[in-house]
Amino acid sequence: MAGHSKWANIKHRKAKQDASRGKVFTKYIREIVTAAKLGGADPASNPRLRAVVEKALSVNMTRDTINRAIQRGVGGEDNDDLKEVTYEGYGVGGVAVLVETMTDNLNRTVPDVRHCFSKTNGNLGTAGSVAYLFTKRGEITFDDISLEDKIMDVALEAGAEDIEVSEDEILVITSPETFGEVQDALAAAGLKSDNAEVVMSPSTKAEITDIDQAKQVMKLIDMLEDLDDVQNVYTNVEFSDEVLAQLDA
């Protein structure tokens, strides 16, 4: 759980630093369009769509904008050429990296992603080179740890696979298939999550204890996330307490 907490801290810090509201909107709109295209327009029966709609609302995207994106998805307008492609590679220190993209031009995306790896002493790998180190799962988080007992009762009854509790959050873990059901059950019980999404979770961690390597890893993540075509970046990095303190300084 320590690794999850450390990485959560880095993710939160990164989110606070990300001032590009327009870029965030663009990425969420692409995800909404694709989620609606693949799973339908009803968030109640489309967990992927519901998760991204909640994220979009959290950054103050209007309902009108969200609904237009959903209609684009189900109507097939302007998105027929949009493809989901995942790239895999390694950063310094043997850190595994999964890069989920949504692109209409692979000739643009591949060089852009490769450039990020090469500029930070990493390597873009082939399909399957690191994917086996990650597991797809649902994660529902709560910042109020005083709700532990109630969350545990409701989530496990609804089919959650596991619950992890740290000093600052409760993490409910589900299979991708039961993610929506567990989320519904928690909401029906009056338990509003602080974040809910289906992610690629690392099964093993690569610990970084050197601050220079840590900065290279963070630079790689930042460069990838700044690319317009990139939707999500997942790694198996775990920073030591000393390195984490220096990164947060």
Swiss-Prot record:
<dbReference type="InterPro" id="IPR048300">
    <property type="entry name" value="TACO1_YebC-like_2nd/3rd_dom"/>
</dbReference>
<dbReference type="InterPro" id="IPR002876">
    <property type="entry name" value="Transcrip_reg_TACO1-like"/>
</dbReference>
<comment type="similarity">
    <text>Belongs to the TACO1 family.</text>
</comment>
<dbReference type="Pfam" id="PF20772">
    <property type="entry name" value="TACO1_YebC_N"/>
</dbReference>
<keyword id="KW-0963">Cytoplasm</keyword>
<dbReference type="GO" id="GO:0003677">
    <property type="term" value="F:DNA binding"/>
</dbReference>
<dbReference type="InterPro" id="IPR026564">
    <property type="entry name" value="Transcrip_reg_TACO1-like_dom3"/>
</dbReference>
<dbReference type="GO" id="GO:0006355">
    <property type="term" value="P:regulation of DNA-templated transcription"/>
</dbReference>
<dbReference type="Pfam" id="PF01709">
    <property type="entry name" value="Transcrip_reg"/>
</dbReference>
<keyword id="KW-0805">Transcription regulation</keyword>
<keyword id="KW-0804">Transcription</keyword>
<dbReference type="GO" id="GO:0005829">
    <property type="term" value="C:cytosol"/>
</dbReference>
<protein>
    <recommendedName>
        <fullName>Probable transcriptional regulatory protein A1S_1496</fullName>
    </recommendedName>
</protein>
<dbReference type="InterPro" id="IPR017856">
    <property type="entry name" value="Integrase-like_N"/>
</dbReference>
<dbReference type="InterPro" id="IPR049083">
    <property type="entry name" value="TACO1_YebC_N"/>
</dbReference>
<keyword id="KW-0238">DNA-binding</keyword>
<dbReference type="InterPro" id="IPR029072">
    <property type="entry name" value="YebC-like"/>
</dbReference>
